[in-house]
A protein has these predicted regions:
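N-terminal secretory signal peptides that target proteins for export/translocation
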Residues: 1-14
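Bacterial N-terminal signal peptides
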Residues: 16-31
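Sec/Tat signal peptide C-region and signal peptidase I cleavage site
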Residues: 32-37
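Extracellular ligand-binding/catalytic regions of CAZymes and related secreted enzymes
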Residues: 38-54, 69-70, 77-84, 248-358
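Catalytic beta-strand/loop cores that center a nucleophilic Ser/Cys/Thr
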Residues: 40-42, 79, 85, 103-105, ...
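Helical hinge/lid and interdomain linker segments adjacent to catalytic or ligand-binding clefts
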Residues: 44-48, 57-59, 63-156
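A structural signal for well-ordered alpha-helical segments within the folded catalytic domains
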Residues: 54, 68-72, 106-107, 114, ...
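A glycine-rich, often tryptophan-bearing local segment used as a flexible ligand/cofactor-contacting loop or short
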Residues: 121, 126-217
Length: 358
């Protein structure tokens, strides 16, 4: 006998089928919003190499220089080529979970710093919740190594009426002069010395520290697309390895500017022994380079990786020419600020950078 389903039975069957399909898809793929929100960081386990057992945590969050690209590239390189465990943290939209460095108050996953051997900071004007900021402060107060990239000299910014216990980390602080940048890295934000996006940098090796282990395999000069930053407050105790000269254009063949800045070379890369608010001393390395295009320069990458070795207590493992070949490709984007709508359209999450930009 032919069975003809009733409207009621067909409706029940359809509801069950749809429910099953939704549940199956969710179990296999997860919803886009939930998957993005749950994905806090890029975590890469190191392979064999001198960095095995060491944990490097990258804290990114700046609007101009594509730190999410450059620092992820270094994490892949350090993990695959040299054995370091690496975690990369990103500024994200708290609702969608997508990467958006315009979100100045949200960098999830900072608890990863509890196990960090080195913190790499590439952030600008952040005002993080006190609970999150505490992880950064704890790292510094323990005297652990810090590697600051370009905007890290002005990583934090608080409103004048802030009651946060970390308000003095502001780059304009007068109570803790110059805040985190000046006290931990050696200087706070001063100004662009070269013209932004119009005058590139040619960095020259400093003769006083020519034999420094971190300079092994690094050329005498390094070209960067980013302009020279003013750095005015370093002390004689700070070790300047490179100084930056302003070029008249954005190409490595461009001549130096022909004005009063022609013979001025600002600190470009240096080591410092800092004293934390706790009174404990630690070590930092800073470079005013940092745009994603800058890292196409092999010698700059080698300087960065060698500095990580040094800060990790592995200076003796720095070879004659540290391997800094890319892992998974590297196609950096130009410098420039993007709108919230543009970041939402890109829909980038940490896993996007697991093996190179798509």
């Amino acid at each position: 006998m032919l069975f003809l389903p009733t409207v009621k039975s067909f409706s029940a069957w359809r509801t069950s089928a749809v429910t099953f399909c939704v549940a199956l898809c969710a179990s296999l793929f997860g919803s886009v919003s939930n998957a993005s929100a749950a994905e806090k960081s890029l975590v890469l386990k190191g392979g064999e190499g001198p960095g095995r057992g060491k944990h490097i945590v990258f804290v990114t969050g700046e609007e101009f220089y594509r730190s999410e690209e450059g620092m992820s590239m270094f994490a892949r390189l350090l993990a695959r080529r040299h054995g370091f465990d690496c975690t990369v943290l990103f500024a994200t939209d708290p609702e969608s979970g997508v990467i958006n460095p315009n979100q100045g108050k949200h960098i999830p996953g900072l608890e990863a710093l509890k196990s960090a051997d080195v913190m790499v900071l590439f952030a600008r004007f952040r005002e993080l919740p006190d609970g999150d900021m505490k992880h950064i402060a704890d790292h510094v107060n323990a005297g652990k190594p810090v590697l600051g990239v370009r905007n890290a000299t002005h990583a934090f910014k608080y409103p004048p009426d802030s009651t946060s216990p970390y308000r003095n980390w502001d780059y304009r602080s007068r109570d803790w002069q110059g805040g985190f940048g000046q006290q931990i890295l050696g200087d706070t934000w001063v100004a662009h010395y070269g013209r932004f996006q119009k005058e590139a940098t040619l960095a020259h090796r400093e003769s006083a520290h020519r034999s420094h282990p971190v300079l092994r395999g690094v050329a005498e000069t390094i070209f960067c697309h980013t302009d020279v930053n003013s750095v005015l407050r370093l002390t004689e105790a700070d070790e300047v390895l490179f100084r930056g000269q302003v070029l008249s254009g954005l190409n490595p063949t461009d001549a130096p500017v022909n004005d009063a800045r022609k013979d001025v070379r600002m600190p470009f890369a240096w080591f410092r022994t800092y004293t934390a608010p706790s009174g404990v001393q630690g070590r930092s390395f800073t470079t005013t380079a940092g745009a994603s295009l800058d890292w196409l320069n092999e010698d700059l990458r080698r300087l960065f990786v060698n500095a990580v070795f040094s800060l990790s207590g592995l200076e003796g493992a720095i070879g004659d020419k540290t391997d800094v070949t890319f892992v998974g490709g590297y196609q950096p984007k130009p410098t420039g600020m993007l709108s919230d709508a543009a970041w939402a359209k890109l829909m980038l999450t940490p896993s996007h950078f697991a093996e190179g930009a798509r």
